[in-house]
Amino acid sequence: MAESTVRKGHQKPLTSEVALRGKKLEHGDGEVVIIGGMVLDIHATPSVRANSGTTVPGKVYYVRGGVARNVAECMSKLGAKPFMISAIGFDMAGNLLLNQWKSAGLSAEVGILKDKDIETPVVCNLFDINGEVAAGVASVEALEKYLTPDWILHFRNSLPSAPVLMVDANLSHPALEAACKMAADMECPVWFEPVSVTKARRISFVVEYVTFVSPNEDELIAMANALSGCDEFQPLKESQKKNISVMSLFQLLKPAIWVLLENGIEMVLVTVGSNGVFLCNKGGPRHFKKHTEKINRTGFGGQLYKAFMQKNPPSRSSGISELNKSSHLFAVHFPSLAASVVRLTGAGDCLVGGILTSICAGLDIMQSVSVGIAVAKAAVEAEANVPNTFNLSAIAEDAKSAYSGAKVLFHQSML
């Protein structure tokens, strides 16, 4: 088991400042800017085990999806008002997405390109009887064709006041680069959502601009290989993960995580299914701090902040000595929460949506990840990618469980 540097009498708070490239992540009157896909998901779920070559009874649902859209909808239902940049058509799928977007009180007048020539992105997923994706077909070419650098740059004036820009990897290489360079010019931190194993490799085009990434295990491996320039890392086999301890799983993923941190990414958030989440940075607990003097705690964001702080102490002593060295990998493990699983597809997006909303409400990164895990729990218990409503009290209570269960997993030199 890896040693952590713990000395009694020299304890430092684990949760305070998040050091971000360019500027501190603060919230005034700005909105999170989100660029990426608005997609209609078709979910086919058999009621018995599916057989090749024939149909089986089950249910087929039309679900509003797309990583960026899911994150934005989640944030809106948590009280934030993100600014969305995307593209859809005037077809059935586009109308379904647009009508829901307007009903959520979000603006569709600017940011979302609408054109009769656009075929709205559609993804069809076939699930197994356990709720896991068994196979899928994605028709999302319109995102690369119509979400162009020119369209994105129309909205550069939205970034100066934005606390963060989130991009999903559905964007083409030129569009990703344009968005991230635009953010860098405005000193706006960038959150990169990898979307899929194939598209996760697009991190190599923009890594110098990225502050946060949120891959799952397989996406992490793909990103590390893309940044290494070779297939140095192999995806974990199911046999490797069977009955494995959290520490052993982290040790398997640690070299890939370090590649991302060595390439300048400041925070790596790895989702590991039922094993929870790893939050990793390069340095130590000092880099988990965040100034909150200018946070605007009004509206629902203020309620979220108050609800969390009532359930949890304002700071937690971790017993970690202050080894702020660039050669040190610092990792915290958050456990998953027990849930009555209906569907797993929206969990990761709601995790990110919960984290972003919480940061903007004034919670630090540890607290925000705890809220994100609570929001993800609510997502897996719903049929839709994003639940119709969130219960603030339940979110705060579940966040308390995630927060109290967080443990420092690793704090050691990588030299």
What are these regions (language model features)?
Residues 1-34, 199-200, 226-415:
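Conserved phosphate-binding/catalytic region of the ribokinase-like
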Residues 2-104, 123, 130, 135, ...:
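Glycine-rich phosphate/adenosyl-contacting loop at the front of the ribokinase-like
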Residues 59-60, 85-90, 107-120, 193-195, ...:
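Beta-strand->loop->alpha-helix junctions that form or flank phosphate-binding loops
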Residues 87, 111-118, 123-164, 169:
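Conserved phosphate-binding/catalytic loop of the ribokinase/pfkB sugar-kinase fold
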Residues 183-192:
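Short beta-strand/loop segments at the ligand-binding rim of alpha/beta enzyme cores
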Residues 194-209:
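Short, glycine/polar-rich helix-capping loops at beta-to-alpha or helix-loop-helix junctions
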Residues 210-220:
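Non-cysteine beta-strand/loop elements that form the S-adenosyl-L-methionine
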Residues 220-221, 277:
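A generic structural signal for short hydrophobic patches within well-formed alpha-helices
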